[in-house]
């Protein structure tokens, strides 16, 4: 029974980590588009999110060969 609780706890923690990363990647994409095209997704090519301590690093790339990095800061509630 204890092993089941441990496995369940680990699964919940991993699920939380994945959901935080997905949310951060979505925030990254929105921030890239907002900063470069004022919300227009037509020239958007790709975004990569790398988690860091107290935030993350976004790599933004557009079809017109514009590439840049953004540092996101996560606010702690």
Curated annotation (Swiss-Prot):
Q: Does the keyword Secreted apply?
A: yes
Where does it live in the cell?
A: Secreted
Mark the transmembrane ranges: none
Could you tell me one molecular function GO term of this UniProt entry?
Answer: toxin activity
**Keyword Ligase annotated:** no
Q: What range does the record give for the signal peptide?
A: 1-25
The superkingdom listed in its UniProt entry is Eukaryota
Propeptide stretches in the record: 26-46
Record's comment on post-translational modification? Contains 2 disulfide bonds.
* UniProtKB keywords: Disulfide bond, Neurotoxin, Secreted, Signal, Toxin
The record's account of tissue expression is: Expressed by the venom gland.
**Mind telling me which GO cellular component terms the entry cites?**
extracellular region
Q: What family does the entry list?
A: Belongs to the scolopendra neurotoxin 3 family.
What is the name of this protein?
A: Putative neurotoxin 2
Question: What organism does the record attribute this protein to?
Answer: Scolopendra mutilans (Chinese red-headed centipede)
């Amino acid at each position: 029974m204890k092993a089941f609780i441990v496995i369940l706890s680990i699964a919940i923690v991993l699920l939380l980590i994945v959901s935080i990363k997905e949310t951060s990647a979505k925030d990254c994409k929105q921030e890239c588009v907002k900063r470069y095209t004022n919300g227009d997704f037509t020239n958007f090519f790709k975004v990569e999110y790398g988690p860091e301590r107290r935030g993350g690093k976004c790599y933004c790339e557009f079809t017109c060969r514009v590439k840049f990095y953004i540092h996101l800061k996560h606010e702690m509630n």
